[in-house]
């Protein structure tokens, strides 16, 4: 539960993201910023319910899902980011965005259109090319 009447979790208390990438502090601050907006709006509406105070999490989760997917790929020994980038160099900018925490925009997860099938191939879930 991320929020309740009169309280809300932010930062690592809301959702820890593996520190393998240096963007963890940014995500903690971003969650605080989004939660602060929900709190200010709650005061303006005289609504400090858990629903109002947690309204920021949908946007946050939509962005951080891409980092969680990237971390999952990182810890899969069979997957090689180097080999993936050689095959799909057009994703270099997207990978850079993910690594620096630029994830709150449409298209942030475009790399996974190719990365997910590549992962499935190395794990033998689908035939190799």
Language model segments and positions:
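Conserved mid-domain beta->alpha element of the FAD-binding
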Residues: 1-66
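C-terminal helical "tail/cap" subdomain of flavin- and related membrane-associated enzymes
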Residues: 40-129
């Amino acid at each position: 539960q991320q929020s309740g009447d009169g309280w809300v979790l932010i930062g690592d208390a809301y959702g820890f993201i593996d520190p393998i990438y240096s963007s963890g502090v940014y995500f903690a601050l971003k969650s605080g910023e989004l939660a602060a907006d929900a709190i200010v709006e709650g005061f303006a509406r005289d609504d400090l319910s858990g629903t109002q105070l947690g309204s920021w999490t949908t946007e946050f989760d939509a962005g951080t899902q891409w980092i969680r997917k990237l971390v999952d790929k990182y810890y899969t020994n069979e997957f090689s980011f180097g080999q993936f980038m050689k095959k799909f160099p057009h994703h270099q900018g997207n990978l850079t965005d993910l690594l620096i925490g630029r994830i709150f925009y449409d298209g942030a997860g475009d790399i996974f259109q190719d990365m997910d099938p590549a992962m499935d191939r190395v794990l033998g879930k689908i035939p190799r090319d």
